[in-house]
């Protein structure tokens, strides 16, 4: 049976949104902080805590307590969001014209792992004429890591 936790951050204005700020607020480090997944409530593995920070994801709060997301739930809910909330796709050049900004100035996350794409990953989409996808009003593409893993998966399925 779960014990009821006391809310850490009652005031929504004082809630840290990113992991480094949460660590500072709790006077701990990214190497020591213990977080649960907002979906499955399992404790994140240390690697998942590091991945959460690397992906620059936001901490969410339930009853004043901070939560992150584990890898399994992140990938699962990313796929659900893609299926339920896909709007449309555009080539990079069209996206730049639509926003009147270069791709490097636009936040585009990986459709699978939610990591922000780096300039090289965005350029790869341009070079290979791959589209970016608008899901729930946010732009997504594929990071190098997810591209490699999906290619490997396809090759082993043959």
Curated annotation (Swiss-Prot):
Family as reported in the entry's similarity comment: Belongs to the papillomaviridae E6 protein family.
Single GO cellular component term: host cell cytoplasm
Designated name of the protein: Protein E6
Family annotation (InterPro entries): E6, E6_sf
Reported function: Plays a major role in the induction and maintenance of cellular transformation. Acts mainly as an oncoprotein by stimulating the destruction of many host cell key regulatory proteins. E6 associates with host UBE3A/E6-AP ubiquitin-protein ligase, and inactivates tumor suppressors TP53 and TP73 by targeting them to the 26S proteasome for degradation. In turn, DNA damage and chromosomal instabilities increase and lead to cell proliferation and cancer development.
Principal location listed in the UniProt entry: host cell
Other facts: Belongs to the high risk human alphapapillomavirus family. The cancer-causing human papillomavirus E6 protein has a unique carboxy terminal PDZ domain containing substrate. Part of the antigens expressed and presented within HPV-positive head and neck tumors.
Keyword entries, A-Z: Activator, DNA-binding, Early protein, Host cytoplasm, Host nucleus, Host-virus interaction, Inhibition of host innate immune response by virus, Inhibition of host IRF3 by virus, Inhibition of host RLR pathway by virus, Metal-binding, Modulation of host cell apoptosis by virus, Oncogene, Transcription, Transcription regulation, Viral immunoevasion, Zinc, Zinc-finger
Zn finger spans (unnamed): 37-73, 110-146
Stored Pfam families: E6 (PF00518)
Species, as recorded: Human papillomavirus type 16
Tagged with keyword Transcription regulation: yes
């Amino acid at each position: 049976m779960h014990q009821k936790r006391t809310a850490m951050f009652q005031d929504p204005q004082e809630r840290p949104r990113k992991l480094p700020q949460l660590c500072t607020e709790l006077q701990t480090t990214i190497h020591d902080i213990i977080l649960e997944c907002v979906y499955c409530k399992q404790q994140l593995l240390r690697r998942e805590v590091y991945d959460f920070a690397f992906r620059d994801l936001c901490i969410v709060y339930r009853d004043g307590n901070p939560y992150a997301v584990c890898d399994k739930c992140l990938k699962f809910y990313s796929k659900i969001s893609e299926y339920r909330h896909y709007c449309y796709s555009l080539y990079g050049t069209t996206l730049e014209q639509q926003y009147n900004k270069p791709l490097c100035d636009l936040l585009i996350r990986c459709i699978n792992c939610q990591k922000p794409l780096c300039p090289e990953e965005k350029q790869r989409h341009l070079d290979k004429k791959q589209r970016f996808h608008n899901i729930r009003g946010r732009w997504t593409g594929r990071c190098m890591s997810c591209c490699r893993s999906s290619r490997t998966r396809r090759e082993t399925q043959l």
